[in-house]
Amino acid sequence: MKITKQIKIRDVLVGGGAPIAVQSMTNTDTRDAQATLAQIRALADAGCDIVRCAVPDMQAAEALREICANSPLPVVADIHFDYRLALAAIESGVDKIRLNPGNIGGADRVQAVVKAAKARHLPIRIGVNSGSVEKHILEKFGGPTPEAMVESALYHVGLLNDCDFDDICISIKSSSVPNTMQAYLLASEKTDYPLHLGVTEAGTEYMGTIKSAAGIGGLLALGVGDTIRVSLTDDPVKEVYAAKAILKAVGRAEEGINVVSCPTCGRTRINLIDIAKEVEQRCQSIRGKKMKVAVMGCVVNGPGEAREADLGIAGGDGVGLIFRRGEIIKKVPQEQLVDALMDEIAHYEGE
């Protein structure tokens, strides 16, 4: 795993070997501070670490004052083109700015934003995607290739460095999973700044989760990436659940219950599909535990096949088994199986 430079977003560390931070973005009207705060609280309850809000106009920038004062999460202002919105957002108390300095005007405007960010020790994320690459770079590479996106990101980094600013995070996103992965791998070779991973315009919950798992999960498995955002055309809370599931899948989660289950076969004598879904749903919001839970379809092979699980259940004809590390610890009536498992999880303290 590559150790990058570290930035601090309120009280959340990103990079430098810190745990992978999960991000999301509100889809409320930022000008409606109460609605935005309600969504931020829901994201926090789901396990989100950092939240981003769109700042399309000055009214939204002013609303950030109330939002930032009451948000349980660090707030990132998403700025496009108008440097005055960045200055207003900083004045309102945001914890980080997301912008591309090459898109906000001349050097004097970049310097103004950098000066304000420095005064409050705020990092800036450079956010490049395949649709934002500068014309001269597109012409050089013949399109928004991974190499073009990385050159665009480094161009913006250079603008900030020219202002003696180094508190930087980078994202380089494409809707193409292969292009996204290639871009981040190249960026990881060329820079030590922390990388914010994501696949842009990933789609609805189903396809967007699959694309994000392939792209984000693949990069994390290779040791690349410091913070992640799963982009879904859906409730932002689902982005957080998907992101945390990806972290579990690649072994990078700091907490959470990793539920595994067998695919069922002719030996299955219980409604394993519904049981597995119920266990997964009930485990989703449990905080402060890190463990593996198995849901298996038969008592013959279940405990043995899932011996690496901390806890698990296996169904039979009328009676279910609860096991720990492959050893049977309890038999319970099948209709009590899930409740009995959840009770064991609640009292599990680890080895």
Q: Where do the protein language model's features map onto the residues?
A:
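N-terminal amphipathic alpha-helix/helix-capping segment at the start of soluble metabolic enzymes
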Residues: 1-25, 118, 281
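Active-site mouth loops of central-metabolism enzymes
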Residues: 17-35, 54, 73-81, 137-150, ...
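Hydrophobic faces of well-ordered beta-strands that scaffold small-molecule active sites
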Residues: 20-26, 51-53, 75-79, 97-99, ...
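Glycine-rich, proline-tolerant flexible connector loops at the mouths of alpha/beta enzymes
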Residues: 27-33, 44-68, 98-106, 168-177
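Alpha-helix-loop-beta-strand connector modules within alpha/beta enzyme cores
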Residues: 58-79, 112-124, 184-195, 279-283
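Glycine-enriched alpha-helix->loop->beta-strand junction motifs that scaffold or abut catalytic
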Residues: 70-73, 91-97, 118-121, 188-194, ...
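Hydrophobic or amphipathic alpha-helical targeting/insertion segments
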Residues: 84-125
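Catalytic alpha/beta core domains of metabolic enzymes, predominantly
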Residues: 128-129, 137-284
